[in-house]
Design a protein with these regions (language model features):
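Bacterial Sec-dependent N-terminal signal peptides
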Residues: 1-26, 275
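Phosphate-group recognition and catalysis centered on beta-loop-alpha active-site segments
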Residues: 23-275
Length: 275
């Protein structure tokens, strides 16, 4: 049995190695693979591109955590464990890192589509099996490990806030951040891009628009939270402006476009006079 397990790990290791040879493993610390499960090879494609932040939507369906955006019935065998947790665990077992030589956690964002409390209780049960690779909270202390799980969507704030130990954190609402006196519950803050600004990158951004955006990001950073905006224009000019404001994560479904963006130097976006 032990020999078989070791053989499986070797096969996985060489599979990852062969796959990663095709693309240099530069870790894209600011890239966020939105709706990652829609790619041909969920998780693996993102890892191939060096993405350090990955999202999966889940439904609690027949006591399983099914990865899907809608209609989990048609994807009932595509579970969070099979597509994400088990492969990450096996990859770490092979090389002691998710990315060789990269000693920071990657983020696995789990967007909960069903009841917050019921789904979290099942998620908690599943995460226990992989606790050796998961960042943990234990009586006021955070211990970073290879993978940090962050819950978005339907979030069980009260349930998680009462826990003395857990292996998940919360993605806060950037526009209405919760008071987190311990700074140990919410490690991120997100909002829909259009709820912050309407700028699409096709014309100069006003100074006031940019200041407003930068202020949201600055406020989150003072509370120790990484910032992500979703449904952002897929325009490198907008992305560059967001990076100039100090945003932590660029949100996109397009892995190639993100890698290309982070590989190039960009001219500063135009800024119009205040309106």
């Amino acid at each position: 049995m032990v020999k078989l397990f070791k053989l499986n790990l070797l096969i996985i290791f060489f599979s990852f190695s062969a796959f990663n040879d095709s693309v240099a493993q530069t870790v894209l610390t600011n890239a966020f693979a939105h709706n990652d499960y829609k790619h041909k090879r969920p998780l693996l494609d993102a890892l191939n591109y060096g993405v350090a932040n990955i999202e999966a939507d889940i439904f609690l369906y027949k006591n399983k955590l099914v990865v899907a955006h809608v209609l989990p019935y048609f994807r009932k065998n595509k579970t969070l464990e099979k597509l994400y947790l088990q492969p990450l665990f096996e990859r770490f077992a092979c090389q002691d890192d998710i990315y060789s030589g990269y000693n920071k956690p990657i983020i696995l964002m789990i967007d909960v589509k069903t009841n917050a409390s019921k789904t979290y209780l099942k998620l908690k049960e599943v995460l226990q099996k992989y606790q050796s690779i998961l960042t943990s909270y234990d009586n006021g202390k955070i211990t970073e490990r290879a993978v940090t799980v962050v819950i978005s969507g339907n979030k069980p704030y009260e349930l998680m806030e009462k826990e003395c130990q857990r292996f998940a954190f919360i993605d806060d609402n950037l526009k209405n951040m919760t008071s987190d006196s311990t700074k140990n519950l919410c490690l991120m803050a997100s909002a829909k891009y259009s709820n912050i600004t309407s700028w699409n990158g096709k014309q100069p951004i006003s100074i006031l628009q940019k200041l407003k955006l930068c202020e949201f990001i600055k406020q989150a950073h003072t509370e120790g939270k990484k910032v992500r905006l979703w449904a952002i224009p897929q325009n490198p000019t907008v992305w560059k402006m967001l990076m100039d404001c100090g945003i932590d994560l660029i949100n996109s479904d397009n892995l190639e476009k993100m890698r290309s963006f982070f590989a190039k130097k960009h001219a500063a976006p135009f800024i119009a006079q205040a309106q």
